[in-house]
């Protein structure tokens, strides 16, 4: 790909352009993925891949969390407090990780080739192009997801816009005292506006 001096990450683009321009780019990204990637490669869910996902992705990651030295003590609490708000701890949420329920849920998912890591930081924008359909490209695909559903791409995008992933990665420090976790987390109004726009698009796209 030819280097473009006008290319910037979507995070920077969001915070230096009107919200409507960022929303137009994300609508274009989602539309292009749907038309050029998801639909042409659509296929039924694979029960073996679902089983592999549950074992290698979900259970293995939960085990890593449970066994991590820095998290071991936190695991023992029924509830944890994050920035002054109480949450049920992971061990109290076992129903969310029930294999039988998740097999049924995942079997109904659309499955196709996906990007696999569609966070804000992996979308690059061209500031010298006005047409939103030609003003972006995506980088760093992740093909190791096993159960490849477009919902994973949508979830990664919401990890950014709803979860504030990029802001969280800029947090300088975090304190942990017993079951209390505290850190400074900022979030921009531009992210809030774009989150609502993307949710509207996904509701229309998924029929919700």
Name what the model sees in each region.
Residues 2-9:
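Conserved short submotifs of the Hanks-type protein kinase catalytic core
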Residues 95-150:
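Active-site acidic catalytic loop and adjacent metal/ATP-binding pocket
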Residues 22, 26, 107, 111-112, ...:
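Aromatic-acidic/polar surface patches that form glycan- and anion
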Residues 135-136, 142-208:
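Active-site activation/catalytic loop segments of kinase-like enzymes and analogous catalytic loops
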Residues 1-2, 157:
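Elongated alpha-helical scaffolds
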Residues 6, 32-40, 160, 164:
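Phosphate/oxyanion-binding loops and surfaces in catalytic or ligand/nucleic-acid-binding neighborhoods
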Residues 10-14, 147-150:
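Active-site-adjacent loop/helix micro-motif of nuclease/hydrolase catalytic cores
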Residues 11-78, 83-84, 90-106, 200, ...:
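Conserved kinase catalytic-core helix
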């Amino acid at each position: 790909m030819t280097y473009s001096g006008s290319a910037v990450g979507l995070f920077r683009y969001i915070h230096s352009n009107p919200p409507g321009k960022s929303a137009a780019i994300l609508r274009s990204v989602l539309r292009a993925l749907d038309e050029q990637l998801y639909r042409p490669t659509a296929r039924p869910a694979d029960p073996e891949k679902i089983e592999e996902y549950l074992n290698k992705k979900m259970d293995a990651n939960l085990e890593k969390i449970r066994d991590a030295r820095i998290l071991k003590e936190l695991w023992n609490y029924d509830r944890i407090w994050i920035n002054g708000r109480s949450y049920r701890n992971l061990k109290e949420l076992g129903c969310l990780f029930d294999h039988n329920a998740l097999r049924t849920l995942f079997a109904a998912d659309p499955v196709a080739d996906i990007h696999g890591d569609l966070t804000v930081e992996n979308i690059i924008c061209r500031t010298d192009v006005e047409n939103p359909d030609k003003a972006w490209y995506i980088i760093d695909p992740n093909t190791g997801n096993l159960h490849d559903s477009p919902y994973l791409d949508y979830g990664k995008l919401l990890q950014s816009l709803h979860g504030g992933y990029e802001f969280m990665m800029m947090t300088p420090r975090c304190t942990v005292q017993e079951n209390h976790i505290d850190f400074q987390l900022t979030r921009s109004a531009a992210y809030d506006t774009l989150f609502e726009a993307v949710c509207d698009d996904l509701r229309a796209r998924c029929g919700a």
